[in-house]
Amino acid sequence: MNKRLGLLLGVLVSCCTLAAEHGVKVVSPDRFHLEAGDLSLGLSQDWRQPLPKVTRALIIVHGRLRNAQTYLQSGIDAANHAGVGGDTLVIAPQFLNQADVKRNHLGDQVLQWKANDWMAGEPSTGPGHISSYAALDQIIKHLGNRTLFPALKEIVIAGHSGGGQVVQRFALTGHDHPLLQTEGISLRYVVANPSSYAYFSPQRPVPFDAASCPGFNDWKYGMQKLPDYVGHQGAQQLEQTYVSRDITYLLGEQDTDPNHPALDKSCEAETQGAYRLIRGHNYVDYLRQRHPQLGHRLVEVPGVGHDGDKMFTSPQGQKVLFPQ
């Protein structure tokens, strides 16, 4: 049985790898024009015209499969189940790579990244250069336009799996948006089932030999070799900003498979725990040791493993995304 299971996992890993190399089948239909190029994204409503009924915007970030439209639908379903579909705008950015652009004949105006570099906030490879995190900043800036969104009160940035990695690191490095404060628009982050987290010190929950894993404290796992997007901020400043932000960790109670095909099994990630659920608990414990008054929340979703749709549409997911 173990041999058969191993073969099945091998097939799953191969399929995921092939999907990444061959490009996505579905490219989101909308475009957000930025100076560096056009960002592919999906929208639940046309945000180019005023949306006077929208009080909340949900920016939902896909994982490494870059299936933004799947996440867009999960966000729409979660909002509808929570009874807030009418006043919620769902935005699903799509961080395409070079294979996606080639497969879908997208031309030279659509932003693209090398492989999965977008997860760590690296700049696009074309047509211009912009960090994936800076692209999120531009979405937030657009939402601060009171002519288009006169009733907006809250922006929620949520991501699952690879998208959870993006949201965690973006919450850590993300630039301030004074316009939101001026306009009374709050900003929250929901980090769901990421494979790893960025630590602020060399401390890790699992004993390991640093000599055999020299990159354990490099970005995206630690504070060494930070991306250009961070600018001149140091680790201490980043940590103080991060712990002050409104962050919820949404973890699947059954996301406990140490051999999951999409789990980061690098030595850098293994220092954080054996599987996603324990890695999440370990990280929050680490933060609470350093900041006893930490206001972050950890919410488990019973009976759910590594499934973005079930996480966000669950009663717990709805409550986190759309608190009444």
Protein language model features and the residues they cover:
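Active-site glycine-rich loops that stabilize anionic/oxyanionic intermediates
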Residues: H62-R66, S195
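C-terminal catalytic histidine-bearing segment of alpha/beta-hydrolase fold enzymes
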Residues: L250, D264, H281-Q324
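A domain-start/cap signature at the N-terminus of enzymes
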Residues: L18-A57, L65-L89, D117-A134, K153-A158, ...
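Conserved alpha/beta-hydrolase
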Residues: G85-D100
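Structural cue for short, hydrophobic secondary-structure segments
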Residues: L58-G63, A92, Y249
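Conserved acidic catalytic loop of the alpha/beta-hydrolase fold
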Residues: A134-L152
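The feature captures the conserved acid-bearing segment of alpha/beta-hydrolase catalytic domains
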Residues: T182-Q289
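Cap/lid segment of the alpha/beta-hydrolase catalytic domain
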Residues: L96-I130, A262
